[in-house]
């Protein structure tokens, strides 16, 4: 996602953390909760222990990770690959790679087991957008884009078909500073929804990536200040809701953790937003409803550094 505060006009709470004298703590305990709800104080998210069995007790057999890396080369320099090696996913999906295929860093070949690698990037915009999909298992079929020329120029979608499901990784367009691309985003949302509905009619679907929208108020720290900003406009939120209903798909994280607050995947580099957890949940694993019995866990790895987004991980028992 473009840098909010540098490239995007997204309101974030810039107040510094306040410390209180011991004598005042008892008097201000109630106020602290109010401040946290308003995005004015520390309210951190702790990723719970991984659940590696399905509701019926089947052990997880597939682990997928997704990460907006905000530039492959910079991410590698920040030790992003070290985290991937430790996490050891079966499939790794990357967004905002900002790298054409002929300039991919050699270090990517060092990833153990992820030898089947697929990349998409704009042909005429070096250093912009781009997605990647790396897998232990060779997919049955791989395709790029959503089949519409207007939407397939920026390297935003890879589709990989496996035996029991289809995986789509996407870097959804940002509505931009001043919402200059909001109309385009709405056209994208409609076309993407139709495309996914067609895929899901043939085989269960997993959609992952930076979907560039915080669906509900619980999904960002400062909802009141962002209702007219990219990523939280009524139009984008409605488009996301229509996607869930029409395809149909389930938000795996909210399916398991419907009321968990402060669970974000993106923080602007500005104003110490990450240390204060002033963030947005923009990255998702969405699943066909037929896959919900196989859902073991949907994780937000908020402590993993290397980008302005953190990685997310999905466990399925297929």
Curated annotation (Swiss-Prot):
The active site is at 171, 210 (proton donor/acceptor). Residues 23-33 are annotated as: Necessary for interaction with NPM1 and for efficient rRNA binding. Mg(2+) 1 binds at residues 70, 96, 308. InterPro entries: AP_endonuc_1, AP_endonuclease_F1_BS, AP_endonuclease_F1_CS, Endo/exonu/phosph_ase_sf, Endo/exonuclease/phosphatase. A motif (Nuclear localization signal (NLS)) lies at residues 8-13. The keyword Translocase does not apply. Residues 1-60 are annotated as: Disordered. Probably binds two magnesium or manganese ions per subunit. The keyword Glycoprotein does not apply. The record marks 31-32 as: Cleavage. Residues 1-33 are annotated as: Necessary for interaction with YBX1, binding to RNA, association together with NPM1 to rRNA, endoribonuclease activity on abasic RNA and localization in the nucleoli. The modification S-nitrosocysteine is found at residues 65, 93, 310. Disulfide bonds join 65-93. Multifunctional protein that plays a central role in the cellular response to oxidative stress. The two major activities of APEX1 are DNA repair and redox regulation of transcriptional factors. Functions as an apurinic/apyrimidinic (AP) endodeoxyribonuclease in the base excision repair (BER) pathway of DNA lesions induced by oxidative and alkylating agents. Initiates repair of AP sites in DNA by catalyzing hydrolytic incision of the phosphodiester backbone immediately adjacent to the damage, generating a single-strand break with 5'-deoxyribose phosphate and 3'-hydroxyl ends. The N-terminus contains the redox activity while the C-terminus exerts the DNA AP-endodeoxyribonuclease activity; both function are independent in their actions. An unconventional mitochondrial targeting sequence (MTS) is harbored within the C-terminus, that appears to be masked by the N-terminal sequence containing the nuclear localization signal (NLS), that probably blocks the interaction between the MTS and Tom proteins. Belongs to the DNA repair enzymes AP/ExoA family. This is DNA repair nuclease/redox regulator APEX1.
